[in-house]
């Protein structure tokens, strides 16, 4: 698609592409902080309810939101997540609930670049090439919208 072709203007740094967890979440965040404009962790959870896509938002807890680097970056994290969900919704992807679920994650606790963990489905979700293309198109649209392109 045209949205997907534009993504090649940005470089994607794949930190992990399987279940091998040689690098922990802090190490992945450090890599992203030093080498990326944003950090997007793509996940398919282990449930079988086919509930749809959503992002892990920063919890609305004052003690957490007042801790650095969260204090300086939580709004960027949530804005990136909302933009990705909007892009996915626009591509016709099923969205869970309001599109977000509050969760205290290591990734957002240590990130100084916009960083989000997004669940794209689960074991019951369709994993066909056409669905993966649809997810990719939605994510590209969300990234482009976030960066104002």
What are these regions (language model features)?
Residues 2-149:
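Active-site-proximal helix/loop segments of hydrolytic enzymes
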């Amino acid at each position: 698609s045209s949205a997907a072709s534009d993504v090649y203007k940005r470089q994607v740094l794949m930190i992990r592409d399987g279940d091998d967890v040689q690098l922990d979440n802090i190490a992945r965040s450090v890599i992203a902080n030093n080498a990326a404009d944003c950090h997007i962790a793509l996940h398919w959870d282990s449930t079988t309810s086919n509930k749809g896509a959503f992002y892990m938002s920063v919890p609305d807890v004052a003690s957490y939101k007042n801790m650095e680097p969260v204090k300086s970056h939580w709004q960027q994290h949530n804005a990136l997540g909302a933009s990705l969900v909007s892009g996915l919704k626009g591509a016709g992807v099923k969205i869970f609930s309001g599109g977000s679920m509050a969760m205290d994650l290591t990734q957002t606790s240590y990130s100084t670049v916009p960083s989000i963990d997004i669940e794209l489905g689960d074991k019951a979700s369709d994993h066909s090439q056409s669905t993966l293309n649809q997810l990719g198109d939605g994510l590209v649209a969300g990234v482009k919208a976030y960066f104002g392109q």
